[in-house]
């Protein structure tokens, strides 16, 4: 069992793209929902769906075989391909 919160996983993805929570423009999750623990490991999808926007990127939940993480794509055309999700 891999218990995580969206706040933890989003924080990691924000860092990987050179952004931080101060760059967030809007998020569909409440502060409380960001801190709900769920099993992000393989199995069933448990994390609440969301979309989060910064000035540069759009972040969203991704899943494979029940394992959940955060993906992102540029808000504007940047000539960079998006990897398979």
Name these PLM-found stretches.
Residues 1-39:
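N-terminal domain-onset segments
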Residues 4-7, 57, 75:
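Arginine residue identity/basic-tract feature
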Residues 26, 42, 79-81:
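Low-complexity, compositionally biased segments
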Residues 29-66:
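Amphipathic, interaction-prone secondary-structure segments
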Residues 65-73:
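Amphipathic alpha-helical scaffolding segments
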Residues 72-85:
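Compact, glycine/acidic-enriched structural inserts
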